[in-house]
Amino acid sequence: MPDIEGRIAALPIWSGPVTLAPLPGGISNLSFAATDQRGKFVVRVTRDFPFHHVFRDRELMSARAAHAAGFAPAVVHAEPGLMVSRFIDGRTLTVADVQASIPRIAEFLARFHRDMPAQLSGPGFIFWVFHVNRDYLRQLRDSGQPAAQLDRWLATNAELEAAQVPLPITVGHHDLLAGNLIDDGRRLWLIDYEYAGLGTAMFDLANLSSNNNFTPAQSRELLAAYFGHDPDEQLLRSHAAMEAASLLREALWSFVSVNHLDRPGVDYAAYGRENIVKLDAALAAWHERFGQ
């Protein structure tokens, strides 16, 4: 990437000299910590990823809405290819932290889903994981991947979609990795809005639990805390199906990324295979518990 640090340093928003340091983590985007006389910021180097349904105008719209609703840091500057936000001085959560904070995070998500729609402006963007999976499978088919395996995953995707229960449309985050939650000692913050958009709460709930290795008991605890009552069998079945759909999406995301992304040190194919192993285990458990 030609002299990206020089471009960042030349932005007119800085007060005095600016110091840049690459931020670790992330398997698709590059970010820097930037410090000037006013404080610390995060600079996100961006471009559209149409193959992943990621468009940066939508990310910016969602990030600004999340700040207005009280969930995300302020965006202080945005231009094609760059987005600058306030740095949150806090501790990035781990998987163990998420598992130990289920009621707190459930309450946070319930507020997020309640308060975000009123702050969102501009054209709506739908995130429906089953459509995303179908499109990923179409892309993989077009790139020459073996049809038999793709057909099996397509049938699995349809089976999991049929298990969903009706829920209201809201605004979801759709990328609930532990690393996107920050605790500043007083409250939680949620960052990284490239997949945010309209959808149902179920994907956020299942994405959180599947990304953070919840047990069935922990998933039940999450649903009870979020909905305010013990989940019935239909809700549990729907959530477990969505967990599997989330794992399928993560695997297909990886396989599609092989053809488009090249972050140093990231083996997208291996990451995809890891998620297929998790998917197969989740499907076996789902069928054993809830039947075909």
Positions of PLM-derived features:
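An alpha-helical support segment within catalytic cores of ATP-dependent transferases
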Residues: 1-19, 117-174, 184, 231-235
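Charged catalytic carboxylate motif
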Residues: 104, 108, 152, 204, ...
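Active-site acidic catalytic loop and adjacent metal/ATP-binding pocket
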Residues: 22-43, 158-203
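Active-site activation/catalytic loop segments of kinase-like enzymes and analogous catalytic loops
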Residues: 202-231, 244-263, 278
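Activation segment
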Residues: 48, 90, 188, 196-198, ...
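Start-of-helix signal in alpha-solenoid helical-repeat scaffolds, especially tetratricopeptide repeats
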Residues: 237, 241-244
